[in-house]
Amino acid sequence: HVVNIACQTCHIPTYSKEVATKTWWDWSTSGDDNRNIVRDKYGNPLYVKNKGDMRFGKNIAPEYAWFETGKAVNYVRGQKIMDPNKILTIAGPTSTIKDNKARIYPFKVMRGKQAFDAKYNYLLAVQLIGDNGYWSTFDWKKSAETAMKASGLPFSGEVDFIETEMYWRINHMVSEAKDSLDCLDCHGDSGRMKWKELGY
């Protein structure tokens, strides 16, 4: 197993053990005056006007993927979005089972929806504070226009939203040895590994 599986995979069976962590952030639903702040069982807001819908979790089982240092996708500002109807991976591993040096690692995957330019097909920079800031105007066009001018990239004035994801490799929150994963946690009938997605 040590050849194909990172130490963290077995020794960090869950993350955010003590404090809930945000797992979803949908900017597209923000700005609604007709919705009230709703909180989850941990006391975290599930909806706030200036941020939109959010979800939180605690003691979460990681998601797993092949990872090799130096092999990852990282979205760069201005990079074209090839298909706005598909989930855009902003940061994540690109290794597969065929990469000899890759191992299966645990990840927190942060998902949500972000603003993008529907004509130029790239993510938008958005100013949040200040006179034209979104949190003052709740006007995506104004706030994006100001921020995009500062970024040096053209802005068409057409704002839409795309679902995004970011993979964050988990290295901390190691559990005691007695709480680490055992064989059936992965290989049992209800094991946590998605073997087909991992290439098996």
For the regions a language model picked out, list residue spans one by one.
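C-type cytochrome heme-c attachment and multiheme electron-transfer modules
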Residues: 1-200
